[in-house]
Amino acid sequence: MKSTKMTTAQALVRFLDNQYVSFDGKEEKFVHGIFTIFGHGIVVGLGQALDENTRDLKVYQGRNEQGMAHAATAFAKQNNRRKIIACSSSIGPGAANMVTAAATATVNNIPLLLLPGDSFATRQPDPVLQQIEQSYNLGITTNDVFKPVCKYWDRVNRPEQLMSAMINAMRVLTDPAETGAVCISLPQDVQGESFEFPEYFFKKRVHKITRPLAVEEEFYECLNIIKNKKKPIIICGGGVRYSEAGDALSKFANKFNIPIGETQAGKSSIKSSDPMNLGGIGVTGNLASNIIAKDADLVIGVGTRFSDFTTASKSLFKNPDVEFVTINLSKFHASKLDSCKMVGDAKECLEYLHKLLEKENYISSYKDEIKDAKIAWKEEMKRLTNIKYEENFEPIIKFRNKESLEEFKKLTDTTITQTSALGLIRECIDDDSIIVGASGSLPGDLQRMWETESLNSYHMEYGYSCMGYEIAAGFGAKLADPEKEVYSILGDGSYLMLHSELITSIQENKKVNVLLFDNCGFGCINNLQMSNGIGNLATEFRYRNSETNKLNGKLIPIDFAKAAEGYGLKTYTAKNLEELKNALIDAKKQKVSTLIDIKVLPKTMTDGYESWWHVGLAEVSEKESVNEAFKNSKKILKGARKY
């Protein structure tokens, strides 16, 4: 048996370089590179291996460990989970910084390989710099915190353990039903220790991503439900995107006259102009989808997790006879809501079910309802995009601090409303541009208002809704699709939380366009707070008032364009729609990353449409407005499913 003496880290690099995936007969390299921020716990181990021979892996220099891991997640997502960039860090704080990104990847079922350094396996120098010591268990390190947020976790305490650890890591990373974050913890001494690794460990491995078909019994059980239903609705989830099942879903829906509601993850799997596509569904959904969903007697969930935002906390479907049918690779997700399930690939299952329903001559009983719902939403879209600031202006959101809007207007001299800005942006940028989002009020506006005609052009992280994802993910999406314009759309709150990978985008000459909506606060949480009877507390960006000792002083102005200019970006400030349009046009011409600081009036985002969100309200309060909000919530909850 032939073997080669190598360090653990050298063997890891060689192994990663030989991983491939095959999908629908197309073979592709799986691991394209490694993000890293070197520290003492990784630089002389894995760092030495990469310096000696990176093979065909590209090394990227991150600026923040969470940021680089978000970029890697977005790279994998934009590649439909068939390409990854691994992430390595030092021990302690560097590793801990990646925990949030690990959770983000796992919630969204996106493959993310994390390689954090760890304290010494021998324990000889304990406590090493940045090591946590727990008196009840010396085996615990910072890296144990990855366990709850990863789909696979391992620690390589001996060089020979690397083999089983990495084979299992690849098993999970390439499994569409189980994928998510994988953490392989690398003690810093073990990284440099050597072993006679067998050559067969380094052979080219092609991980086949297959299209399993549900068993026949499941199909016929679901068929018997569907054929007796008159008003079904399909929920298009992220599984449709990753299965590349958009065409199959469109044909299925149009053949049987079944309307489609999109989740955040499923959006852009099919065209917005598709006659059956009603658009976003649920809490952040639009009027068309939610009105149709309310009366549906059957919900067909395709590749969806049925999150609370999709089901409006299980209150959206009000027909007492409603039943649920699912197509999902994951039996766990397929079984939710007491669904009759088909456990398998979305495309294969849709095509097989299509043939079965065709034999039954099935057609839904909808007449003009689908078309009328789409027309009504088009009219609402026109209204939203044409909302302008004028005398006696009343913003969309009614629950608010009355003074905030005029104070912000006076401070910035802006007249831009959030919905009109989004309408203009959609009009100005190319159809095949990729937009990236994650948090705040913008995902709701985008799910409702953004129309997609180009496949996979809508990149939204709304499983973990992680503030700070947007810019790093914009960079990751650009790495995945360098020929397209990428726009990271985010609020000032999210920008302030994390924007470090802007520097990496400049370093790599990968242009990202940042559309920063500045309304001087955490706008959507302020809406949630005040709409439930609570006061305006710590959700606007205000100075501490020396007289009241509270955060109710004046608004804090920030010149985001000026700050970003210092990083080397081409920047703009927009205070009216003409300035915004000119900035968008000029930004397209630039070769370097850009930032448009869009000053948007508070409370001018969209509101909900026929939906409710279950949040944990106070049962008792001295404020009658809070008590009233709780009573209303309790009333709605009575009509929602219990599980």
Swiss-Prot record:
GO terms for cellular component: acetolactate synthase complex. The keyword Amino-acid biosynthesis does not apply. Belongs to the TPP enzyme family. Involved in the cleavage of the C1-C2 bond of 3D-(3,5/4)-trihydroxycyclohexane-1,2-dione (THcHDO) to yield 5-deoxy-glucuronate (5DG). It catalyses: 3D-3,5/4-trihydroxycyclohexane-1,2-dione + H2O = 5-deoxy-D-glucuronate + H(+). Pathway: Polyol metabolism; myo-inositol degradation into acetyl-CoA; acetyl-CoA from myo-inositol: step 3/7. Its EC number is 3.7.1.22. GO terms for biological process: inositol catabolic process; isoleucine biosynthetic process; L-valine biosynthetic process. It holds the Pfam family TPP_enzyme_M. Residues 441-521 are annotated as: Thiamine pyrophosphate binding. The keyword ATP-binding does not apply. Thiamine diphosphate binds at residue 65. It comes from Clostridium botulinum (strain Alaska E43 / Type E3). Keywords: Hydrolase, Magnesium, Metal-binding, NAD, Thiamine pyrophosphate. Mg(2+) binds at residues 492, 519. GO terms for molecular function: 3D-(3,5/4)-trihydroxycyclohexane-1,2-dione hydrolase activity; acetolactate synthase activity; flavin adenine dinucleotide binding; magnesium ion binding; thiamine pyrophosphate binding. This is 3D-(3,5/4)-trihydroxycyclohexane-1,2-dione hydrolase. Binds 1 Mg(2+) ion per subunit. Binds 1 thiamine pyrophosphate per subunit. CDD domains: TPP_IolD, TPP_PYR_POX_like. Its cofactor is Mg(2+); thiamine diphosphate.
